[in-house]
């Protein structure tokens, strides 16, 4: 972290998960998240939690648990605000997996792993990529595998998403290995 952004104000993954589940209880069923508690804990632990804004390795303003939406560069979030953003961001990832990846046909481990991936890299980035040879965005192998309901191939392609800014990052390699294992039921 660059000194010009100041020190990170970390928050407890357990506290965020507890606030997430407390908020979830009061919601109508259709508004509740579909990922398992295991997936929520995994996402929070893999992303980490920082209450103040900072720039992530992709040079994007971020706060909370990997939140990049409407980040106020002057605000320190409460745990409840972090949990609210987390619920919204997981719901967005769930919508992606349900809409484009046949999420309703996946088992819970496959679903949880794919939601974690979509949460981390964004829906558009797991659905398509820019092909230099074709000069346009084309469907990813993971997207085509999910469309064909080839769940094993889909799970095995999770590790394709191990780069940020064109560089392979050890942290992303580790995360993808965990997501792949969850997806394959290991």
Curated annotation (Swiss-Prot):
Family per record? Belongs to the glycosyl hydrolase 24 family.
The role this protein plays is: Signal-arrest-release (SAR) endolysin with lysozyme activity that degrades host peptidoglycans and participates with the pinholin and spanin proteins in the sequential events which lead to programmed host cell lysis releasing the mature viral particles. Once the pinholin has permeabilized the host cell membrane, the SAR-endolysin is released into the periplasm where it breaks down the peptidoglycan layer.
For this UniProt entry, which segments traverse the membrane? 1-18
Which GO BP terms sit in this record? cell wall macromolecule catabolic process; defense response to bacterium; killing of cells of another organism; peptidoglycan catabolic process
Q: Which GO terms describe its cellular component?
A: host cell plasma membrane; membrane
Q: Which reaction does it catalyse?
A: Hydrolysis of (1->4)-beta-linkages between N-acetylmuramic acid and N-acetyl-D-glucosamine residues in a peptidoglycan and between N-acetyl-D-glucosamine residues in chitodextrins
Name of this protein: SAR-endolysin
User: Quick check: keyword Magnesium in the entry?
Assistant: no
- Tree of life domain: Viruses
Origin species, per record, is Haemophilus phage HP1 (strain HP1c1)
């Amino acid at each position: 972290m660059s000194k010009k952004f100041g020190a990170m104000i970390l928050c407890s993954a357990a506290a965020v998960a507890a606030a997430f589940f407390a908020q979830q209880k009061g919601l109508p069923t259709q508004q509740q998240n579909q990922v398992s508690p295991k997936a929520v804990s995994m996402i929070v632990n893999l992303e980490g939690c920082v209450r103040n804004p900072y720039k992530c390795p992709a040079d994007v303003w971020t706060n909370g648990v990997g939140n990049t939406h409407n980040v106020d560069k002057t605000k320190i979030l409460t745990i409840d605000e972090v949990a609210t953003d987390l619920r919204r961001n997981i719901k967005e990832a769930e919508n992606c997996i349900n809409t484009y990846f046949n999420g309703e046909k996946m088992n819970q481990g496959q679903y949880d792993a794919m939601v974690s991936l979509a949460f981390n890299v964004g829906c558009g980035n797991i659905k398509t990529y820019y092909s230099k040879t074709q000069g346009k965005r084309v469907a990813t192998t993971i997207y085509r595998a999910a469309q064909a309901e080839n769940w094993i191939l889909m799970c095995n392609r999770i590790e394709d998403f191990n780069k940020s800014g064109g560089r392979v990052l050890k942290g992303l390699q580790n995360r993808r290995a965990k997501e792949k294992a969850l997806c394959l039921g290991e």
